Amino acid sequence: MIKPLHTKIEEIQNLKDGYLIRESYFEYPKGKSNIYKVSLSKKIDWYAELPFEDDVYSNPIILKENHFICASWKGVDSHISLKDGSIIESKLTRWTKKQSEQEDQPNVFHSLRSFQT
């Protein structure tokens, strides 16, 4: 059995070489990813890269062949590599006037990556 690191496990996806875990984002430590891969020997292989440093993954994982997709609390759909947890593509799907007026948000689009298929 896999034990959560910080909150409670919301989702487990079985992989060939381990497990993909999504913990509850509620009260999860800020700046840490709540999605991570655990090996068959129960060691953490990697944490999924966050689209923003202060974001969390709040939606179910959509598992694909070599990556997975998950939406964040701030409205970013991220395609994340199953190899190392890095973001290979991300798309901002939600944006509010309040967010766009914040001083730390003007360069938000520079932190988003896209990848050619």
Language model features with spans:
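Secretory-pathway ectodomains
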Residues: 1-117
